[in-house]
Regions:
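N-terminal Sec-pathway targeting helices
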Residues: 1-13
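Solvent-exposed serine/threonine-rich low-complexity stretches and specific carbohydrate-binding patches
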Residues: 128-140
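Sec-dependent signal peptide cleavage junction
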Residues: 20-39
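Histidine-/acidic-rich catalytic cores in large beta-rich domains
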Residues: 44-122, 143-146, 150-560
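Hydrophobic membrane-insertion alpha-helices, especially the h-region
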Residues: 11-22
Length: 560
């Protein structure tokens, strides 16, 4: 009996331990969900600041934010607040990040008795002052005012001064304070800033820092010229690729199967989903004149059946959201696919055929595109994209296409003595007034990597680097003048940059050049002569910034 009693007590104890462990697990899991939710939802920490009640929306993750049904319900809550009471300049409605798409953002709503334009200044201890004039779609001077404030510093008190100026120049001000949530992805509010030798003024705007892998969570940061993070846009599990502003909408990717448009107030007004298709986004997209999204993609069915990736162009209808294939590169470059049979060994596409690796797309017209193919170190122009795609030309060293079908016939003639681009990224089209004549600028990675053809000779690419970031090599900003009328291209500008074998971007902005040497986690701005004005560096241990572009956000957040 004593033995049976001992066994019973042991069994009972085991059950209690098991139940206790289960309860602890459930509590920890619930706590984790709560913590996740709390990092997304704002706190009304400031004078006259209101926070919406989200308890009925079941928001637990970033993916919940980017559901249009959720956003519609949030908009209804805001509308109810606005209609229940009249808000004046003295007693305005101020909401903390109501749409949850900018960690440090504020929503303002009020009316003025006179038509006024609204400007604001943000001050926070130890940081530079941020000032802007707000864009009002009702006109420069208006009586009805609804805005999103960009520029607050996360996790510390900000003093915000709003100024209303009427058409006679008379001003009225209102000042209040607010402490936003801390940043979701970073512990620091400022990047490391290093001054260069150039005395040229930095270009206007905010740097959109896209795909910083040193962060705890995926976000896109808007960074000012002093390196301070002025906005944090959360994304789900992917880079936003780029920001495209058109028709009072801001397009960005939030996952590899979802793009959205935001309005100037931060509301998600449309979501484009690829979840029910066999496509995944990668690298880049453009928006045509009809509001359709033309994107680079991977076909997941072909990835499974043929082990190939990153060689599709798709169209997402801007109205219906319907997804259709525009181009499979294998159909256009069949002879290349017969030759390039090697398997990717270096990137997240290990084990797959990455024959093209298209990494940027530019629309010259709605049915004409310029594609950057990293794997072939080639820039391709394709016409009749939406009907019967046709290769117009290639820009590359002739050695890449020697003995591969008849594609050498597509090569433009190189004018001058320089080494053609290798492993390039961020190819950007800049038109001129002459038909068939334009510029192409790019980040020339100068990386000698081609897993699909391991026997390829890089003899025509002296001093090219390998797959590891190293001070022994250099990348470059390249700017070509392309003349389709003469079938030629020439290098008209070059700036030496820190070496980055993968990723990276460039952009001409206000006659300066913005560059991102992605695998050094450094972006910078250079003057027209190629002298460094200033560089910015993230402080995380992982050195990887996908792309950096600079935007003014005029006629969106800010007035011209």
């Amino acid at each position: 009996l004593q033995l049976k009693r001992k066994l019973f007590l042991l069994a009972l104890g085991s059950i209690v331990v098991t139940l206790t462990a289960s309860l602890i697990f459930v509590k920890q899991k619930a706590s984790s969900n709560a913590t996740s939710s709390e990092t997304i939802l704002p706190v009304a920490n400031g004078q006259t600041i209101t926070t919406l009640d989200y308890s009925d929306l079941n928001i637990k993750s970033v993916s919940d934010i980017y559901q249009t049904a959720t956003q519609t319900k949030i908009a209804q809550k805001i509308k109810q607040l606005e209609t229940n009471k009249t808000y004046s300049f003295d007693k305005m409605l101020v909401l903390a990040n109501p749409y949850l798409t900018n960690t440090t953002g504020l929503y303002l709503h009020f009316s003025t008795t006179k038509a006024t334009k609204i400007s604001y200044t943000v001050k926070s201890k130890g940081t530079s002052t941020f000032s802007q004039t707000l864009y009002n779609p009702n006109g420069t001077y208006a009586k009805d005012h609804t805005y999103q404030l960009i520029g607050l510093i996360a996790g510390q008190e900000n003093t915000i001064t709003i100024t209303a100026t009427d058409q006679t120049g008379q001003k009225e001000t209102k000042t209040f304070t607010y402490t936003p949530n801390k940043l979701r992805g970073s512990k620091q509010n400022q990047l490391k800033v290093t001054k260069g030798t150039s005395k040229t003024k930095l270009s206007s705007g905010l740097y959109a820092v896209i795909g910083d892998k040193s962060l705890k969570t995926r976000n896109t940061y808007l960074v000012d010229n002093d390196g301070y993070i002025r906005a944090e846009i959360p994304t789900i599990n992917y880079n936003s690729l780029r920001l495209v502003q058109t028709d009072n909408k801001l397009y960005l990717a939030v996952d590899d199967d979802q793009l959205v448009t935001l309005d100037r107030l931060g509301q998600v007004v449309q979501s484009y989903s690829l979840k029910d298709t066999n496509f995944k986004l990668h690298h880049d997209f453009a928006v045509d004149s009809q509001g359709n999204i033309i994107a680079l993609a991977t076909d997941t069915k072909l990835k499974a059946s043929e082990k190939r990736v990153e060689d599709q162009i798709i169209k997402i209808d801007g109205t219906s959201g319907q997804v259709s294939r525009l181009l499979d590169f294998k159909d256009l470059l069949g002879d290349l696919y017969k030759t390039a049979t090697g398997i990717e060994t270096l990137t997240n596409n290990k084990g797959y055929r990455d024959v093209i690796h298209a990494n940027s797309i530019q629309l010259t017209k709605d049915d004409q595109v310029i594609i950057s193919s990293r794997e072939t170190s080639t820039i391709m122009k394709i016409s009749s994209l939406t009907s019967h795609p046709k290769l117009d030309y290639f820009i590359s060293d002739p050695s890449v296409w020697q003995g591969v079908g008849t594609y050498s016939n597509l090569l433009l003639n190189k004018v001058g003595n320089f080494t053609s681009q290798a492993g390039q990224h961020s190819v950007t089209y800049i038109p001129t007034e002459t038909a068939g004549v334009y510029y192409l600028e790019m980040f020339n990675n100068n990386s000698a990597i081609m897993n699909s053809r391991t026997n390829f000779s890089w003899a025509n690419y002296p001093n090219s680097g390998g797959a590891t970031a190293s001070n022994d090599y250099q990348s470059s900003y390249y700017k070509y003048l392309v003349n389709e009328n003469t079938g030629s291209y020439q290098l008209v500008k070059k700036i030496s940059l820190p070496y980055s074998p993968f990723i990276s971007s460039v952009q001409t902005k206000d006659n300066n050049v913005v560059t991102d040497s992605g695998m050094t986690a450094t972006f910078a701005e250079y003057d027209a002569d190629g002298k460094l004005i200033q560089s910015f560096e993230t402080t995380g241990s992982t050195k990887f910034i996908y792309r950096v572009y600079k935007y003014d956000f005029n006629n969106f957040y800010f007035a011209n």
